[in-house]
Design a protein with these regions (language model features):
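C-terminal ends and interior cores of transmembrane alpha-helices
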Residues: 72, 93-113
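Short, surface-exposed linear patches
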Residues: 39-41, 104, 114-115, 128, ...
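A short, flexible low-complexity segment enriched in Lys/Arg and Gly/Pro that occurs
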Residues: 1-2, 135
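Generic alpha-helical propensity signal that fires on short helical segments
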Residues: 37-39, 109, 122, 177
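Short helix-capping/hinge motifs at transmembrane helix termini and TM-loop junctions
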Residues: 44, 109-111, 140, 175-178
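Substrate-agnostic recognition of the 12-TM MFS/MFS-like secondary transporter fold
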Residues: 15-30, 63-80, 87-96, 117-177
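Helix-loop boundary and gating motifs at the non-cytosolic
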Residues: 3-68, 115-116, 124
Length: 178
């Protein structure tokens, strides 16, 4: 089913920008500022994987890389399917839900006993976040005319910055109180 929108509709553009408000928080808080530090603080300095011992920072880099290998292999295929079948919104929802549930699961990552939760949660969150962006970005030409691309995109970008900074401040405040 193909979803149609009236181009340059203020409500639709605001909704599109609010998606950026929400998803940009992931890239700042989870990928960059809070989770990497948390991961290194609750894991052993050396993590045993198969027959190999590796520093926890290398393990963290490895799980990020593995997530993006899945994205690099899968997304060209899925975006082609979405374009051909008109299921762009389906994939946007699917990957947003995957990323959201994976972020929720990361709450239960406390120490080495729950390393698998942190690993799987972070990988799925990264896959969900990155994949949802592909389908989110594909909506720009659907919701705006070409002369409004820059303004619409900048609005989403600005909302994303504001939303992510607000969440980072809240998170830092909560961490400081503990």
């Amino acid at each position: 089913m193909q979803t149609t929108f009236v181009k340059n509709d203020a409500k639709v553009i605001k909704s599109w920008a609010m998606f950026d408000w929400a998803n940009s928080s992931y890239s700042l808080v989870i990928s960059s500022a809070i989770f990497p530090t948390y991961f290194l603080s609750v894991t052993n300095a050396t993590i045993h994987v198969g027959n190999t011992d590796m520093p926890n920072s290398s393990y963290f880099s490895f799980i990020i890389s593995l997530a993006y290998v899945f994205v690099a292999i899968g997304l060209p295929i899925l975006s082609g399917i979405a374009d051909y079948s008109g299921k762009r919104l389906y994939f946007l929802r699917l990957f947003t839900i995957i990323g959201s549930l994976a972020c929720i699961s990361m709450y239960f990552f406390r120490d080495m006993n729950t390393l698998w939760i942190g690993t799987v949660g972070f990988m799925l969150a990264s896959i969900g976040f990155t994949s949802s962006l592909v389908f989110y970005n594909s909506y720009l030409p659907v919701i705006a005319t070409e002369d409004k691309y820059d303004k619409t995109s900048a609005r989403g970008f600005a909302y994303g910055y504001v939303g992510s900074v607000i969440l980072l401040i809240v998170n830092l405040f909560v961490i400081e109180k503990k």
